Every structure is written in structure tokens, then in C-alpha cells.
Amino acid sequence: MPDETLTNQQKLARIDAFDAKESKGLLQSVLLRIGPKPWFISWYRRLGPKIDPAISRIGDGSFMRTLYGLPGMVIHTTGAKSGQPRSNPLLYARDGADFIVVGTNFGQPKHPAWTANLIAHPAAAVEVAGVTLPVRAELIEGDDWHATFDRLVRIYPGYALYLERRGDLPPRLFRLVPQP
């Protein structure tokens, strides 16, 4: 069934079923071990955004899950300054129907551009499990920030190291709420 013929509720059901499939990825243990290392961060910061969107589209996203063992999506935003469409691969956590994403920029001391895009234009879309779902971004701040960030660290422990590297600049954390 093509993506366009599905309701957003059906898309969420497909994503829920996809997320329910636990997968120890072929490279998961390696990624969890080398992911936080400076040489890997430097290398993957350049390569990941180029290859991950293509990998995520193989087999409705199942290949990326099989390869990495981590929940990945492609987020589609509108450029904050340019107004042009932008796409970025991200890891995510689920909170009910919502998606939680964080802009760590691999521990670099600046926010990634896609986070500015979401602040300027909160309407976005996520591509997960072979479907594209419209979402609205909400910046998470205050008391909710730490508990929500900890949820992401449980998925990818390297985020804790990225937080240390950023010093006094906490990464932007977003709740992506599916739209009707």
C-alpha cells in the first residue's frame, strides 16, 4: 500500500509495529564501543549525513535497523534562513506517539542547523518504517529536559559524552508530535 493512501493513524500503527521489532544490529556493539571516540565522530560527522538517508530507505528502514540496531529516521525540515527543504538522519526515542530527537552535533560546541530549522519552522515530517508522517516540533526545556535526555542516552550512550564535550551549551531537545 503506497504511503499516500495511508491515514496518519495507519502510518503511526506501521511505525509502532516497526519499533516493536527489537533488533541487535550487525554493527550495534561496534557502534556503541567506537561511536563516542573522537576519530569516529570526526569521520562519521562527514560521512553519516551522506549515507544514512539512503540506508534508511532500503527495505522501509529495516536495513538501517538491521545494520545499526538503533532507531533511525530522516527528518525533513524547512531551512531557517533559506526556506529550502532540508533532510537529516537522526536517532530517535518514542514517547507514546511522539518522537524525541536531540541536536548534539556530535558533541561540537554549536547547535546543528536542523535545530534552528525546527525553531523557525516547527512544521516538519519524519520518514520512518517506509512512511512519511507530518509532525510539529516542540522544544523541550526545563525540568523535562533531563528525564527526556536520559531516555535518549539509554538508546545511545554516546550522547552522554557528547553532552560533556559541549560544556555549557546543552543540546536542543525536541518532541515531534504527529499531526492529524
Q: Model regions: which residues?
A:
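Short beta-strand micro-motifs in enzyme catalytic cores
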Residues: 73, 170-174
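Short beta-strand segments
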Residues: 70-106
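Membrane-proximal basic amphipathic "stem/tether" segments
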Residues: 17-51
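Short, conserved active-site entrance elements at the starts or edges of catalytic domains
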Residues: 40-79, 85
